[in-house]
């Protein structure tokens, strides 16, 4: 198997990262793409009580097990399968279930802080930052957390103002300078997606 191409997609919470990833996935197909979500690599918190787990700052770099993520990316780069961890936000902890991920031509790494860690940056062939208005992002986050994670409106707003927004400004936004491509207007920018697809094909050609 030829060397896979690693694509990093980052941006603030609710920016449209997953939409971009899904569109790339749609255009190239599941035979060609492996998906790695940074959310799957939150640290195991089995040693903490539920009260302490609830206090976890999920938007801080220390929340992620980047050592495991880097190890898994290197394994995929070398043609080996990995067992991607699973995280259950309802219990604020990693669970025993894992997902087998096989090495593919294209590996998409998606998450709010993937460009914050230089070890991850060095593995990425194409680095994408999805830039979306803060008002749009908070609305999307509210919808997701209420519908998918059982949160209340009050808790989502409180978390956004006290954690998400300051962490975004401190850690996520500054990583924009590392991006090769910055996509305005989130995941619905068709022109930008077409450019990304063309760039992926170009890089794939270099590894043939």
Swiss-Prot record:
Q: Which reaction does it catalyse?
A: uridine + ATP = UMP + ADP + H(+); cytidine + ATP = CMP + ADP + H(+)
What is its EC class?
transferase
* InterPro entries given in the database record: P-loop_NTPase, PRK/URK, Uridine_kinase, Uridine_kinase-like
GO molecular function of the protein, one example? ATP binding
**A biological process (GO) annotation for this entry?**
CTP salvage
- Pathway, according to UniProt? Pyrimidine metabolism; CTP biosynthesis via salvage pathway; CTP from cytidine: step 1/3; Pyrimidine metabolism; UMP biosynthesis via salvage pathway; UMP from uridine: step 1/1
Subcellular localization: Cytoplasm
Q: Which family does it belong to?
A: Belongs to the uridine kinase family.
Q: What is this protein called?
A: Uridine kinase
Q: Which organism is it from?
A: Clostridium perfringens (strain SM101 / Type A)
Organism lineage reads as: Bacteria, Bacillati, Bacillota, Clostridia, Eubacteriales
Encoding gene (name): udk
């Amino acid at each position: 198997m030829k060397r896979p191409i690693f694509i990093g997609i980052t941006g603030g919470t609710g920016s449209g990262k997953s939409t971009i990833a899904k569109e790339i996935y749609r255009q190239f197909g599941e035979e060609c793409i492996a998906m790695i979500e940074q959310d799957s690599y939150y640290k195991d918190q089995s040693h903490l009580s539920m009260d302490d787990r609830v206090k976890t700052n999920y938007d801080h770099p220390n929340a992620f097990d980047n050592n495991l993520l880097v190890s898994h990316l290197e394994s995929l780069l070398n043609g080996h399968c990995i067992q991607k961890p699973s995280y259950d936000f309802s219990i604020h902890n990693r669970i025993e279930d894992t997902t087998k991920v096989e090495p593919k031509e294209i590996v998409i790494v998606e998450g709010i802080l993937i460009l914050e860690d230089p070890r991850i940056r060095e593995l990425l062939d194409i680095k994408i930052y999805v830039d979306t208005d803060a008002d749009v992002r908070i609305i999307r986050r509210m919808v997701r957390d209420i519908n998918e994670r059982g949160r209340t409106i009050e808790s989502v707003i409180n978390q956004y103002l006290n954690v998400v927004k300051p962490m975004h400004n401190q850690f996520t936004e500054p990583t924009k300078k590392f991006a090769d491509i910055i996509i305005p207007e989130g995941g619905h920018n068709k022109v930008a997606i077409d450019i990304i697809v063309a760039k992926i094909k170009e890089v794939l050609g270099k590894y043939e």
